[in-house]
């Protein structure tokens, strides 16, 4: 990765993140704290970064103070932790500002935690996102040594989902003037959930099915080296079908085993723990 490419990306990202159209979420962040946004894939972690950038610019910061870097950019080759310092050096050659770091999907860089800890120790303001099993909140809190606030990002609440569909639930008389639309959207919300990208999708099921596969194979099976992935898949389906009634671990193991794939109660306990 060349110095010219990094500088080009830094400049492109500054233009992009300062112009993103946002649906503000009900999130309050404390000034001058460092954050790691973790959570489900496509829950809106990057957009929380963009929202924070918009707030900083509204407060008077220049876009040139923003050092946003997307580590999923296909123009970037595989990076090592030393490349993170190289990115910082390139920024410092471009500007005299002290940068505010926004590092998107940085878990793709091996041993990135060392760089993140050092930035915090040097009193930089830093925001980080990560969406796969390498970024479990319990482990990240330990790895980063208390230098960052771990913020769990969830899909839209119903209120946010309505806002994304141009309905302000706090507006006067909206429950009467938009009653039919609110009921319709609430039904869609409870059918498909509140992942931001599903808003406006005519048929979100196929997209959500692909997302499930990424989470299932990329996060659960790969991380925990689950050999009996069929049993895990059956267990997830049966639990979803039984969402209205409680299930014991023994019952879960029995249901899965009845399909022909034996699952012990201990394994059921482990699998549920992996999903939590």
Q: Where do the PLM segments sit?
A:
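Interdomain hinge/linker elements that couple catalytic modules in large macromolecular machines
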Residues: 2-13, 160-276
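Pre-Walker A adenine-sensing motif
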Residues: 13-32
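Hydrophobic anchor at the beta1->P-loop junction of P-loop NTPases
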Residues: 37
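Walker A (P-loop) phosphate-binding loop of P-loop NTPases
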Residues: 41-42
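Conserved lysine of the Walker
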Residues: 45-46
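Short glycine-rich substrate-engagement loop in P-loop NTPases that contacts/grips substrate
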Residues: 67-99
């Amino acid at each position: 990765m060349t110095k010219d490419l990094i500088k080009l990306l830094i400049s492109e990202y500054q233009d992009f993140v300062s112009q993103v159209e946002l649906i503000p979420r009900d999130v309050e962040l404390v000034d001058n704290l460092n954050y790691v946004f973790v959570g489900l894939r496509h829950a809106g972690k990057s957009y929380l970064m963009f929202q924070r950038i918009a707030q900083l610019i509204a407060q008077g910061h220049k876009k040139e103070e923003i050092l946003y870097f997307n580590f999923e950019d296909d123009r970037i080759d595989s990076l090592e932790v030393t490349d993170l310092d190289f990115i910082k050096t390139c920024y410092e050659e471009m500007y005299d500002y002290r940068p505010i770091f926004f590092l998107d999907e940085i878990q793709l860089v091996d041993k990135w935690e060392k760089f993140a800890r050092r930035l915090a120790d040097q009193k930089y303001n830093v925001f980080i996102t990560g969406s796969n099993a390498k970024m479990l909140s319990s482990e990240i809190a330990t790895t980063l040594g208390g230098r960052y606030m771990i913020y769990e990002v969830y899909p839209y609440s119903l209120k946010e989902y309505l806002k994304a569909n141009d309905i302000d639930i706090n507006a006067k008389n909206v429950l009467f003037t938009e009653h039919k639309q609110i009921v319709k959207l609430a039904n869609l919300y409870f059918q498909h959930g509140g992942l931001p990208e599903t808003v406006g999708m005519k048929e979100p099921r196929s997209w959500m099915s692909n997302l499930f596969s990424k989470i299932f194979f990329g996060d659960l099976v790969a991380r925990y080296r689950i050999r009996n992935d069929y049993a895990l898949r059956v267990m997830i389906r049966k639990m979803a079908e039984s969402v209205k009634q409680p299930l014991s671990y023994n019952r879960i193991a029995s249901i899965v085993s009845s399909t022909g794939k034996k699952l012990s109660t201990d394994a059921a306990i482990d699998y549920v723990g992996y999903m939590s």
